[in-house]
Amino acid sequence: MKVTEMQKNWLICCLLIGLIKIIGSELWVTVYYGVPVWRDAETVLFCASDAKAHSTEAHNIWATQACVPTDPNPQEVLIPNVTERFDMWKNNMVDQMQEDIISLWEQSLKPCVKLTPLCVTLSCSSWRSVNNSVNQTNHVQMQNCSFNVTTELRDKKKQVYSLFYMGDIIPLDTNNSSGNNSQYRLINCNTTAVTQACPKISFEPIPIYYCAPPGFAIIKCNDQDFNGTGECNNVSTVQCTHGIKPVISTQLILNGSLATSNIVIRNNSKDTLLVQLNESIPINCTRPGNKTRGQVQIGPGMTFYNIENIIGDTRQAYCEVNRTWEQIWNTTKQIIINNRKNITFIPNPGGDLEVTNLMINCGGEFFYCNTSQLFTNQNGNTTGNITLQCRIRQIVNLWTRVGKGIYAPPIKGPINCLSNITGIILDYTKSGTEKYTIYPTGGDMTNLWRQELYKYKVVSIEPIGVAPGKAKRHTVTRQKRAAFGLGALFLGFLGAAGSTMGAASITLTVQARKLLSGIVQQQNNLLRAIEAQQHLLQLSVWGIKQLQARVLAIERYLRDQQILGLWGCSGKSVCYTNVPWNTTWSNNNSYDTIWGNMTWQNWDEQVRNYSGVIFGLLEQAQEQQSINEKSLLELDQWSSLWNWFDITKWLWYIKIFIMVVAGIVGIRIISIIMSMVARVRQGYSPLSLQTLIPTTRGPDRPERTEEDAGELDNGRSVRLVSGFLALAWEDFRNLLLFLYHRLTDCLSILRRTLELLRQNIHKGLQLLNELRIYLWGIIAYWGRELKISAINLLDTTAVAVAEGTDRIIELVQRIGRGILHIPRRIRQGLERALL
């Protein structure tokens, strides 16, 4: 019996412990502000450059209006233990740079002269330099043309002459097979609108840095030989990209960035191959000879700059490429062959001159160079340079817009420019089964920017996060809002992104401060840069763009604070709520797994699909809490009775008085109606409204017999009424009877339900009391057992200690007596010896 009772006690204890554990393990939604989480985003980037306003160079003019000065101390923060996906072929930064470079060119050409008046008949003849005694074979490349133009007065014309390259004019009579054409026109007149480049500008680019506005960041991939697509394991966050030179070219990429180790080939899985070299190859372009530039008035306020004469050698321009090209090109071909079989490398098969040739701008002149020597089989010569023959064109089709062209005014004196080849643009076509033909191409300038921006992506900082927590918001109390201080760098905010959620949450307040202070710091830096260079900055649409970047950060911060306010978490870095956490939101992961093994970035990806549901529940909970808080605050009005006599509340008292009087009148009317109903039940009704007719009793009602009559009462009187008022009264009476019976039934059911509820509650309380008494008995029993065991233990210990003490005392006494008896034993021994 005792064993059974002990088993029962242990079972109850286990059940209680399990119940306490279940109740204690319930998780609640906790809001965190300042978590290192980001998401892919598209936003307006602003640019920085080392532009000089006093320079007349075209890019400097554009950069002065569009860019702020560069940061002298750029920051880069590594993010350990983070893997990020990149896609260079779907990068909004490339599209933005494309639009910006188009704006650069269009702004540079906007104030320049349109050459529409030059679409006239040109009378041309072959030109030969009179100052050059060398036998020249290329003299036919220039034509000496005369034509009529409008003078300063629109009704007057005059005849002028100019030298044109053969590539810039075409004969009017295209059917003449003799080749003795004398009448020409400009090549663009039937296709594009040509603008003459302003004479005081050049096209030498300067590095441009693209920067993310506050509230956003640029993620950079630092993996070696990264192909621009897929996952990157070594990432960092920066505020600006490296300096990118907007060099316009085809076939070859000039003055770009180099690969860190091996040659990297990037493919968009369509028909484009971007090759990034691991070492630069010098290319030196030269236009020998000396042009003299004249000017012709072609209308009021319009000047056409023409070539008057060429002094010296008139041979074509050329570019010299270092012989190391052959080795690098052979390595590149081998890498491509290893990935694809049956490959044939050829020069460009044909098309626009800008695509079939290497088109670059050198010193203001547009060079069109034949690159066949670069992409055909090499002769094995390892000395000297590779010389590319080039042609100069003054009328060029612009790559920025279809149907637009540019006339490059002639440049005086010799021209020479040195660049570095850092990449190649290749295209391939597939013929048959696994047969590829690869050739150099160009024209799509986005590939130039994509080669530089492949390792960058823009992300938006999402500092608000939700996660399960063990704490619950129990009471509604007023708390002082924490004020975030200023201090750390904004980029350091993402430094804890690779840490686990538990480790990152320890410094959450610091993270939140970094977020806000970083936003403020970025804006202050931007504003100080603008103020410091306000004598250089010419505010235009680009200035408005900078101001928009500043306003965007404040809008994002205010939006976050508004969301936190809707949840009752304004000004808090960690906010507890009373919304239960649903384990399905976290894929049934345990609390320890979430906080010990996952980063905030991984956690955000897991619960992102449930964010809307969680946020909605947080808003509903806060609304309910606001209602509860309002009700609680309304109870405070009872604390001061003296305010009841305030004159401002008299109208409220009058309203209450009217409501009480109306209630009394209503109760009186209801009592009268109830009295009438009671009388109706007793059989009373106005005589004028009733007529007695016999009716047969139902089987459920027994017949009654009158006391002084011997006849049975076979019926009772019912009313047979006629007339509107009588019918209305009868209907009203029946309605009241029906309502009375139903109300009586409902009241009886309610009374019975309340009685059962009272009995069940009483039984439950009795069971709880019995359980309490039983548990108290168990606790008392085990307490007594523990007390008895302790007493027995103490008694046993005391007895053992006493016995040991007695033995020790007895031993000490024996030793002492032995020592005391030593003289006696000596004396007795001496006595025996003397006897």
From Swiss-Prot:
Molecular-function GO term, any one: structural molecule activity
Disulfide bonds: C47-C67, C112-C198, C119-C189, C124-C145, C211-C240, C221-C232, C285-C319, C362-C417, C369-C390, C569-C575
Region annotated Immunosuppression, chain positions: 545-563
Annotated site residues (Cleavage) in this chain: R481, A482
Any one GO biological process: virion attachment to host cell
Keyword list, A-Z: AIDS, Apoptosis, Clathrin-mediated endocytosis of virus by host, Cleavage on pair of basic residues, Coiled coil, Disulfide bond, Fusion of virus membrane with host endosomal membrane, Fusion of virus membrane with host membrane, Glycoprotein, Host cell membrane, Host endosome, Host membrane, Host-virus interaction, Lipoprotein, Membrane, Palmitate, Signal, Transmembrane, Transmembrane helix, Viral attachment to host cell, Viral envelope protein, Viral immunoevasion, Viral penetration into host cytoplasm, Virion, Virus endocytosis by host, Virus entry into host cell
Entry keyword annotation includes NADP: no
Signal peptide: 1-25
Record-given protein name: Envelope glycoprotein gp160
Organism field: Simian immunodeficiency virus (isolate EK505) (SIV-cpz)
UniProt lineage: Viruses, Riboviria, Pararnavirae, Artverviricota, Revtraviricetes
